[in-house]
Curated annotation (Swiss-Prot):
Residues 202-297, 299-403 form the Fibronectin type-III domain. Belongs to the protein kinase superfamily. Tyr protein kinase family. AXL/UFO subfamily. It comes from the Eukaryota. GO terms for molecular function: ATP binding; transmembrane receptor protein tyrosine kinase activity. Residues 497-768 form the Protein kinase domain. Residues 433-874 are cytoplasmic. This is Tyrosine-protein kinase receptor TYRO3.
Length: 874
């Protein structure tokens, strides 16, 4: 009861409030001539500060031409003005006030705009056949009314005024003609837009035709030309396999859109395409033939007739080449691209070995004995990838194969031998029994206490513990005598080395921290480079020791020097593991240092003067190597080390070669190369010179200026050659001065003889270094020890048919035409390029340290871990 009473009192109070507020003035109807001013007014009383809103045709009006005037504290007046009335201002207007959630509205008023007629329908262009009749429409309205319309056709008045809306009937014309209409009322005359009557015709030739090739599909696009004033309905596409070859059936597509996708085309094939379009009159001429080439694909079949020939010196493998041939009237594709190489993989003892690539359909492998009981398979490779593997072939000695074929004839001999053995056994038993009787008879007369006339010592011990392994010497390796003589005076016994944690792993092995004791019990901290454990020939060891032999002759502050060579003897293994002993570099490799300056836990700034000093150190070291006829072939920031004085030393000579004659070295064996640092001619012909080291020096300068970024970001290794041959090069880093970029850019000339020498680079960098102000004396941030107390370190990885354009930066006097041509693949050379190839002698994760602490033979365990094989993605 009390609740109902409260609601009743509230409603009474609300009604009293509603009755207490009201509009005292309302807007009134007005008819205004177009262009004049109009003003509407409202007055409201009952509220102290009411919010009065103007409405037009149900929408709020937001305008600066509104005014509010206070007549008294509870009486307000507002005005809405339009300075220049146009037709769009005509409509219904009123005022609104919100009070206690209710909307109070004034009575509406209409504004009518009077003027010359305004168009509701203007004449539009017309397309018609010649002589075909058609209608033209024109509609206009006031106020004021009435409105009459006059037609003009071809510049002449057609008939008299007719009421709006007006429809003009035209019997037909034979050529294009202009027209317009003129509506009039009491205020004046309006003139419509000028329309055109077009005569329909056949469409013209198409505009631009384009295509996009993706895998085995092509998306064809074209733009229509003049349509003949008639909408295009269909287009006809003709496709043929190259000019003059068989034409495929026509394809008719509805348009728009003006595109079509051809699917399932032949890979690595030439095609030609042309298009025409149709309207209701006829067809356009065909567009010119557009040629395109589908990309390569991985082969669809494996090589057949895979056989081997085993001799005492070598193993020869051969197989049939893949072809494209007609089979039952249908083209059967096997190769599906340009053959790049044949990939040979082999397995021995259940372990996969490094695959090999060969240009021809035959492989000659030396050292036939090491391939006994090995299984081989071969696959063909194009630029798109490798096809399926062939059936495996098991390599067995000829005697074993003959034994297998003759095994059935051995049963007779086996049975005969068994019979003979039984008879001999029975005879021996009889003889032994007789001999035993004679022995027993003789022992009865033996003197007691007599000495035994014969005694012996066991020639073999059955102790289960392995005996201590002897120290290995160079004589046990089977290397050539010159290399052995060169390393004899730097051979260090393994017992003088105490191996510690792993510093990093690379393609050819690992690097460990170690402590080297001398004969007088003093010692020093060193770094030991250890070859992988899967070596199985003296040639593998010889390759590693050649690097040490190179470094033995190096005596330069910017080239790492050799301390010695040691050999790790393995139980039950014929060959030891070579270990190269090098100075321990406190600050690690240059790439990791630069990377930590940007991305470390505590980033630090490296001045431009110090960056140039890094470049100078590397250039001086490389100048020293070039004077000694050494080609490094793997110059990069990751292979440059920082000693305790922050001087850079060129290191890692695993790919180095000494030039004995001429000025170039041709790569002729399987090796894994850092593609993004390799010069253009080296990628094409496997030729390496000092000028190719200059190219790599330019890339290293780019690494230094970008603080350790990876070169060619976004470009895959398999795309590098095509990227460079088009004239593209590394872009100028954001903070790199133009003069420094000009120096590094000069290192990337496509013509090797146009690149600067290392001595010239030193002169240029010294001039730049001299221009800079001396760096501050105190730069503690530069002396950052990347090693932490617990052995952990930060990770170092961040991981056309047109002719190439030879740009101005690489123009050089005397360039021969043949110097601009390179072969994509060198004939007769095994190809093995690819991968990101980042083997860094740098920080390791704590898990490796933990493993080396708890392993009884840390070397044998850790160096078994290998990085994934990196072969060119062909």
């Amino acid at each position: 009861m009390e609740v109902s009473l409260c609601i009743l009192l509230f409603l009474l109070h609300f009604n009293e409030g509603i009755h207490g507020v009201r509009f005292t003035q309302k807007p009134f109807h007005q008819t205004v001539t177009q262009g004049n001013m109009v003003r509407l007014g409202c007055a409201f009383e009952g509220l102290s500060e009411p919010e009065i809103i103007w409405m037009k045709d149900g929408e709020k009006l937001f305008s600066t031409d509104q005014m509010y005037i206070t007549l008294d504290p509870y009486h307000w007046e507002t005005f809405h003005s339009v300075k220049s009335v146009q037709q769009q201002d005509a409509g219904k207007y009123w005022c609104e006030v919100e009070y206690h959630g209710a909307i109070i509205s004034s009575e509406p008023a209409w504004i009518t705009v009077a003027g010359v007629p305004h168009f509701g329908v203007e004449p539009e262009d017309v397309a018609a056949f010649a002589g075909e009749s058609f209608n033209l429409t024109c509609a206009a309205s006031g106020p004021p009314e009435p409105v009459e319309v006059l037609w003009w056709l071809g510049g002449e008045q057609n008939g008299d005024f007719t009421p709006s809306p007006s429809v003009l009937f035209v019997k037909g014309v034979n050529e294009s003609i202009k027209f317009h209409c003129e509506p009039r009322n009491a205020r004046g005359i309006s003139v419509s837009r000028t329309g055109t009557v077009h005569i329909k015709a056949r469409p013209d030739s198409l505009g631009r035709t384009g295509h996009h090739v993706s895998d085995f599909n092509i998306t064809l696009t074209w733009s229509p030309g003049f349509t003949g004033h008639s909408q295009l309905s269909t287009c006809t596409i003709q496709l043929s396999r190259g000019p003059g070859e068989v034409k495929l059936p026509d394809v008719v597509v509805e348009v728009p859109p003006f595109q079509h996708v051809f699917e399932g085309l032949r890979s690595y094939s030439n095609y030609s395409v042309r298009v025409r379009c149709d309207n209701e009159v006829g067809s356009s001429p065909f567009s010119p033939w557009v040629d395109f080439h589908t990309p390569q694909a991985a082969p669809s079949a494996a090589p057949k007739n895979f056989t081997f020939d085993l001799s005492e010196q070598q193993l020869t493998l051969s197989w049939a080449t893949l072809e494209q041939e007609e089979l039952r009237g249908r083209l059967q594709e096997e190769l599906r691209g340009r053959l790049l190489a044949y990939k040979l993989q082999w397995n021995q003892g259940g372990e996969s070995q490094d695959p090999l690539l060969f240009k021809e359909n035959v492989a000659h492998l030396s050292g036939a004995g090491r391939f006994f009981n090995a299984t081989f398979q071969v696959a063909a490779c194009t630029m798109a990838g490798c096809g399926p593997w062939s059936q495996p072939v098991l390599v067995m000695p000829v005697s074993a194969m003959q034994a297998q074929t003759q095994r059935g004839h051995m049963w007779v001999g086996l049975l005969f031998g068994l019979l003979v053995a039984t008879m001999v056994g029975l005879l021996l038993i009889v003889l032994i029994r007789n001999r035993g009787k004679e022995t027993q008879f003789g022992s009865a007369f033996a003197a007691q206490g007599a000495e035994v006339p014969v005694s012996f010592t066991a020639a073999r011990s059955f102790n289960r513990q392995f005996p201590e392994l002897p120290e290995s010497t160079l004589d046990s390796l089977g290397i050539n005598s010159d290399l052995k003589a060169k390393l004899q005076d730097v051979l260090i016994f393994e017992r003088l080395l105490t191996l510690g944690r792993m510093l990093g792993k690379g393609e050819f092995g690992s690097v460990r921290e170690a402590f080297l004791k001398s004969e007088n019990n003093s010692g020093q901290k060193v770094a030991v480079k250890v070859l992988k454990t899967d070596i199985n020939s003296s040639s593998d060891i010889e390759q590693c020791l050649k690097e040490a032999a190179y470094m033995k002759d190096f005596h330069h502050p910017n080239v790492i020097q050799l301390i010695g060579v040691s050999l790790h003897r393995r139980a039950q293994q014929r060959l030891p593991i070579p270990m190269v002993i090098l100075p321990f570099m406190k600050h690690g490799d240059l790439h990791t240092f630069l990377l930590m300056s940007r991305l470390g836990d505590e980033p630090f700034t490296v001045s431009q003067q110090i960056l140039i000093q890094f470049m100078l150190d590397i250039a001086r070291g490389m100048e020293y190597l070039s004077n000694k006829n050494i080609i490094h072939r793997d110059l990069a920031a990751r292979n440059c080390m920082l000693n305790e004085n922050m001087s850079v030393c060129v290191a890692d000579f695993g790919l180095s070669k000494k030039i004995y004659s001429g000025d170039y070295y041709r790569q002729g064996s399987v090796s894994k190369l850092p593609v993004k640092w390799i010069a253009l001619e080296s990628l094409a012909d496997n030729v390496y010179t000092t000028q190719s080291d200059v190219w790599a020096f330019g890339v290293t300068m780019w690494e230094i200026m970008t603080r350790g970024q990876t070169p060619y970001p976004g470009v895959e290794n398999s795309e590098i050659y095509e990227y460079l041959i088009k004239g593209e090069r590394l872009k100028q880093p954001p903070d790199c001065p133009a003069d420094i970029y000009e120096i590094m850019h000069s290192c990337w000339s496509p013509v090797p003889k146009c690149r600067p020498s290392f001595q010239h680079l030193i002169d240029q960098l010294e001039l730049l270094w001299a221009k800079l102000n001396p760096a501050p004396v105190k730069e503690p941030l530069l002396y950052v020890n990347l090693e932490e107390e617990d052995g952990e370190q930060a990770n170092s990885g961040t991981r056309s048919s047109e002719e190439p354009s030879w740009g101005v930066p690489w123009q050089c006097a005397g360039i021969e035409e043949d110097e601009k041509d390179w072969l994509m693949v060198s004939s007769g050379a095994a190809l093995a390029i690819g991968g990101d190839y980042r083997y860094i002698i740098g920080p390791s994760v704590s898990a490796i340290d933990e493993e080396s602490r708890h392993s009884e033979d840390g070397l044998s365990e850790d160096i078994r871990e290998e990085e994934e094989d990196v072969i060119i993605n062909v």
